[in-house]
Regions:
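Extracellular/periplasmic catalytic domains that process cell-envelope and extracellular macromolecules
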Residues: 48, 71-72, 79, 115-119
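Short acidic-glycine-tyrosine-enriched beta hairpin
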Residues: 60, 90-107
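Ligand-binding loop in jelly-roll beta-barrel domains
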Residues: 107-131
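Histidine-centered metal-chelating micro-motifs
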Residues: 65-67, 86, 101-113
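Glycine- and acidic-residue-biased ligand/ion/polar-headgroup-sensing regions
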Residues: 71-90
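Extracytoplasmic low-complexity repetitive segments enriched in small/polar residues
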Residues: 43-44, 58-62, 86, 99-101, ...
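A short, N-terminal "cap"/entry segment at the start of jelly-roll beta-barrel domains
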Residues: 2-54, 95, 102-103
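Short coil/loop residues immediately preceding or within conserved phosphate-binding loops
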Residues: 55, 75, 107
Length: 131
């Protein structure tokens, strides 16, 4: 496991106890995202200058999906808080339910959808370039 991914996993656990900051990003119809917290990684780890670790809560309403996207330069850890989400990678679709998690690394191209009758609520931690 590389240092960047390990740092993301360790920081994600530590950040869960931090107070929630609110910010809403533009998202597709039926999906809402609330930024929970972020930290400038350069102040924590020398080798990740210009990047932050961001934790968000994303909700997919029933029938909602996002578009296919890449995780090149932005690794991500996803935890399903409630409901079910289907993660599509190429021809493979995998359903994740409450209490399950998955990752998206530099070679990941995927999209997600909620085919269920209840909202799917995800906690998403991503390392991104500082804006």
């Amino acid at each position: 496991m590389n240092a960047l991914r390990m740092s993301a996993i360790l920081c994600t656990g530590a950040l869960a106890a931090v107070a929630i900051a609110t910010a809403t990003a533009q998202t597709p119809r039926g999906q809402s995202t609330k930024q929970l917290v972020s930290v400038d990684l350069a102040s924590e780890i020398d080798s990740v200058q210009g990047r932050i670790l961001r934790m968000q809560m994303t909700t997919y309403d029933p029938g909602a999906s996002n578009t296919a996207h890449s995780h090149k330069d932005r690794p991500e850890v996803v935890y399903v808080l409630s409901g079910k989400i289907i993660d599509h990678r190429g021809d493979v679709a995998k359903e994740y339910g409450a209490g399950e998690s998955f990752t998206a690394g530099k070679d990941t191209m995927h999209w997600m959808e909620n085919q269920g009758g209840l909202p799917a609520v995800l906690i998403v931690s991503t390392i991104v370039k500082k804006e």
